[in-house]
Amino acid sequence: MAEIPVITITGSQQKEPKEFFTRVFCLRKETPPLGLLVEYLKARGATPIISAEVNEKLLNSWNWVGLEIGYAKGRKPILVTCVRKGGAQDEIFKQDIEGLLNYVEAHREIDNWRVADQLRGCRFYIANILDKNDITEEGYDFNSWILQFFEENCDGMVQIDGQGFYDPQTGELIFELPPIDDEPEPAKPSQQPS
């Protein structure tokens, strides 16, 4: 029987993207235009990278659905999406809110009522999708500024997969969610001074 040669690929190999979600559940009725988010990020010393196809009209629109925002060349961008109650993704909105509400109400913790009230009053939520195999500390900080923008400007409450929900005033974890896998989750970056 002939031997079958084993061929190995040298050099760096791309890992399969591993999606990681962070969200802000917002009570405000309308989402701010993306242009305000971009200005907020610039004010923090970041240089948001946006596709040249994104024009002023889109950046000034209140009715946006999603946008990829890069934080560093050579790194995958963060996908910032908006899911609205009663919008085109209403079914997704209802499923996500209902699923989280069921979990929160089934697990009695000291502050679960605060999370349940936030979810019941939620008009839209922002879901940031990150690739855990490609993000750096700089990317986590950049993502935390995006979360902070919506938390501050839209009466939001931050939720991070595998961690939980955070108090909007203190930044403290107030309701813990189970880990999403065996890997340790990154700590929530500390609140940046405004």
Where are these regions (language model features)?
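Acidic (Asp/Glu-rich) sequence patches and key acidic residues
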Residues: M1-S194
